[in-house]
Swiss-Prot record:
It comes from the Bacteria. Part of the 50S ribosomal subunit. Contacts protein L20. InterPro entries: bL21-like, bL21-like_sf, Ribosomal_bL21, Ribosomal_bL21_CS. The gene is rplU. GO terms for cellular component: cytoplasm; ribonucleoprotein complex; ribosome. One of its GO terms (biological process) is translation. The lineage of its organism: Bacteria, Bacillati, Bacillota, Bacilli, Bacillales. This is Large ribosomal subunit protein bL21. Pfam families: Ribosomal_L21p. Belongs to the bacterial ribosomal protein bL21 family. GO terms for molecular function: rRNA binding; structural constituent of ribosome. PROSITE patterns: RIBOSOMAL_L21. The keyword Cell cycle does not apply. SUPFAM superfamilies: L21p-like.
Length: 102
């Protein structure tokens, strides 16, 4: 059984026991979080939401909070002496999917 959930402005396909990296959540490591924006549930009994599946939830356990690898953002305009270099590290939350309730 799998589900498509909406979190952090993205849609993610998840299965039970899977570990996924999502946009940062306000939860500490070891806590349990519930996703209620379930858009689709697949498997033996398929359910499609309009826009979400009523009564469907996905439960996950927060493994850790972290920050992704650093990327360099560079802005440049020729002949204008404009150079701007900036780094960015996106925060993320690592979660393990425990149960899909449909």
């Amino acid at each position: 059984m799998y589900a498509i959930i909406k979190t952090g402005g993205k849609q993610i396909k998840v299965e039970e026991g899977q570990t996924v990296y999502i946009e940062k959540l306000a939860a500490e490591a070891g806590e349990t979080v519930t996703f209620e924006d379930v858009l689709f549930v697949g498997g033996d009994n398929v359910k499609v939401g309009n826009p979400t599946v009523e009564g469907a939830t996905v439960t996950a356990k927060v493994e850790k909070q972290g920050r992704a690898k650093k990327i360099t953002v560079f802005r440049y305009k020729p002949k204008k002496n404009v150079h701007k270099k900036q780094g960015h590290r996106q925060p993320y939350t690592k979660v393990t999917i425990e149960k899909i309730n449909a």
